[in-house]
A protein has these predicted regions:
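Extracytoplasmic surface signature
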Residues: 1-179, 190, 216-218
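Composition-driven, intrinsically disordered low-complexity tracts enriched in small residues
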Residues: 174-218
């Protein structure tokens, strides 16, 4: 888009895993989501950057910690489109260090859980992400989303609330810092004294999550 050139990668074919954006004029990297885990596709829209991946460690930018030893991977991840800090020094073995580069915020309210499929035999879930200002579509070989059977394609409304799995433990369905699934479900209907939804469910501190109204995915 007009902000720059977006790219994603995985370390088997290079030195970086995650998402980056380079300035059109200078070529300098002005945003880097240094999240370990193969990343396959990227979509910037509505001031949020979405990736298709199997990310398992975004701690280098202050995001979710590595739980790959528990089988927790995040296949759909959203980031702010502006830098909110810098990449931390890498301490994980086998990865390059990008400390000091501009880093976005990783949104813990957008971590829907996809269950791996077996079509390619590569133990993957999503391969692509597409969309516009109203809808977000993930495609791949997954066989369920948030514990509900759904194969190969899932559409998310840009006007939804928390997109995470209702129950922690669904494949890739970890809710980050908000991982008490039963409480999340209960809290969705709670409102404060002014009649607004709890901000913990408005993951971008807006009305719903994109300053619109409506539900999440079909």
């Amino acid at each position: 888009d007009s902000k720059g050139l977006y790219g994603v990668g995985y370390s088997q074919e290079g030195t970086f895993e995650g998402m980056f954006r380079a300035n059109w004029t200078t070529g300098d990297i002005d945003l880097m989501a240094d999240c370990h885990g193969d990343t396959y596709d990227v979509l910037p829209t509505n001031d949020v950057i979405y990736v298709a991946s199997h990310a398992h460690d975004c701690s280098n930018i202050g995001g979710f910690a590595d739980r790959s030893n528990e089988g927790v991977y995040h296949h759909a991840v959203g980031f702010s489109s502006t830098a909110t800090g810098t990449v931390r020094s890498n301490t994980a073995s086998g990865y390059s260090d990008y400390a000091g580069l501009p880093a976005p915020t990783q949104y813990n309210g957008f971590l829907p859980g996809f269950e791996n499929g077996n079509y390619t035999g590569l133990s993957q879930a999503v391969w692509t992400v597409e969309g516009n200002s109203q809808y977000l579509v993930y495609g791949g070989e997954f066989i369920a989303v948030n514990g509900t059977k759904q194969q190969g394609i899932a559409r998310f409304s840009m006007s939804g609330g928390d997109a995470n799995a209702a129950q922690p433990g669904d494949e890739g369905g970890d809710n980050g810092a908000n991982d008490d699934g039963k409480q999340d479900k209960k809290d969705k209907d709670k409102k404060d004294k002014k009649g607004k939804k709890n901000k913990q469910d408005d993951w971008d501190n807006q009305d719903d999550w994109d300053n619109q109204d409506g539900g999440w995915w079909w």
